[in-house]
Amino acid sequence: MLLQIAGVCSAQQFSAMVTSLESGEAAFEDGKKTAGWQARSVKNNLQASGADADNATSLVKEQLLHHPVFKAAAIPKTFVKLMVSRYLPGMEYGTHVDDALMAGIRTDLSFTLSLRDPETYSGGELVIEGNDGDTAIKLPAGCLILYPTTSLHRVAPVTEGERLAIVGWVRSYIRSAENR
């Protein structure tokens, strides 16, 4: 299941969140520090820390808990982790599967919320591999893609501009994707 969800935050909330992250207060560091053991060798991006990043991820979490489409599709029990990720030219995240357990908690669904419009950067597509081939996803700012954590995926190299997104993992009340 790949599900695109729009309208996670209001335009005003979204604008304030992105402005706050761009203000320079968010500290970005090597994303390998947050990668699971399987993905560490293929991860080349930056992750934000600090109050602005915490505020952004808290806002997104709160909005998703009240978003009817997200709630119906994910049936969220808990958010395992949310992070602000940034890709500059030359950065990418090679083919990997997200960790099935994070801090001892099962992860069922992964999501990426785009914070940049696709025309503001080149490359940087989220590519999800499947039996029918690859699906390249590059969403407008404010849109989210929800997909099973077990999906083999990658972020294509950014060749120009900056890819900025919030990524997260959800434990559902219902483990099986077929029953969700």
Model segments located where?
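Non-heme Fe(II)/2-oxoglutarate
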Residues: 1-76, 177-180
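Catalytic core of non-heme Fe(II) oxygenases with the double-stranded beta-helix
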Residues: 68-179
